[in-house]
Structures are given as structure tokens and as C-alpha cells.
């Protein structure tokens, strides 16, 4: 039986033309990762990049073309070597430059360099939940909303 609660780990994160990162790659060690730097250094951008390795529009709900580096050709990519319940895998997502064979607004997703139909497939390898200051209503609002949120999170952990 597979343990669906196995912790996911990101061993390497690579960003290409993502927000303020023209090209960046970081290798991580250990279970806890702390991002430290001055305001505007790109800490939140790195977290947002990781959030694109899940279904949806990412942590900030940005449009796909909004996250491209202003100095680039309109394309961007995020990839990560991860370890989770299914072992090691490389997840990648991004968009191609306008004028390439795929429309620029078409997000491509890959697992181990093989195309997958959507980012939902990433959930088999990397599970994440994020809470942002804009979600304060979750804690200040009705208890029924909190229960619904946590029920969804628990349900995802046992899929």
C-alpha cells in the first residue's frame, strides 16, 4: 500500500524568463527551505513559480503572459526535480514564445519530459497548499467556510 501522505520534496528548481528571473537554478537540501533576501529580490516570485507546478493560475492568479520576464521573448518555463509518493520525477510547465508552433497562451505541462494533458497530473508527484494574506476571511469568516476549506485539503491528501 502506498502512503498518500508521503512528504513531497523539491530537490532542484529551475526558472527561465519567469518574472525577474532570466535564468535561475537552485538545488535544495533537507526538508525545510527558507528564502531570505531584501524586498524585491524575488522571494515571492520563486514561490509563485513553484505554485505553477499545480493546477490553476498560480499563487497570484496571474495570466500566463504576465509572468514572463519583460526582457525575454514572451516565453517562460518552470521545472522542478521532485520526490514524492511515486518517487523521483521532473515536472515542468510554461508557455512558448509568440509565433512558435503553439499559441503563446497555451500552457504546456510535462512530467519526465513527456507531455501531460494538464497540470492536474502534477498532483500525483507534488502536493501543495498555500495561504495568503488575502485569504484572511478563511479565518475571520464563518466556521462553515473553514470546514469546507479543510475538508477539501484533507480530501486531496487522500486521493
Regions found by a protein language model. Name each.
Residues 1-52:
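Pre-Walker A-like glycine/lysine-rich segment at the N-terminus of P-loop NTPase domains
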Residues 54-145, 150-151:
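Nucleotide-state sensing region of NTPase/ATPase domains
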Residues 157-159:
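Conserved small/polar residues in nucleotide/adenosyl-binding loops
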Amino acid at each position: 500500500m502506498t502512503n498518500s501522505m508521503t512528504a513531497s520534496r523539491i530537490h532542484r528548481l529551475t526558472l527561465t524568463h519567469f518574472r525577474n528571473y532570466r535564468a535561475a537554478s537552485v538545488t535544495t537540501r533537507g526538508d525545510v527551505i527558507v528564502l531570505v533576501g531584501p524586498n524585491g529580490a524575488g522571494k515571492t516570485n520563486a514561490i509563485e513559480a513553484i505554485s505553477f507546478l499545480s493546477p490553476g493560475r498560480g499563487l497570484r492568479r496571474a495570466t500566463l503572459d504576465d509572468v514572463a520576464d519583460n526582457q525575454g521573448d514572451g516565453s517562460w518555463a518552470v521545472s522542478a526535480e521532485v520526490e514524492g509518493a511515486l518517487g523521483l520525477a521532473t515536472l515542468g510547465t510554461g508557455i512558448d514564445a509568440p509565433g512558435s508552433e503553439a499559441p503563446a497562451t497555451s500552457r504546456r505541462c510535462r512530467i519526465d519530459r513527456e507531455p501531460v494533458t494538464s497540470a492536474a497530473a502534477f498532483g500525483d508527484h507534488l502536493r501543495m497548499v498555500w495561504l495568503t494574506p488575502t485569504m484572511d476571511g478563511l479565518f475571520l469568516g464563518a466556521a462553515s467556510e473553514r470546514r469546507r476549506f479543510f475538508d477539501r485539503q484533507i480530501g486531496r491528501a487522500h486521493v
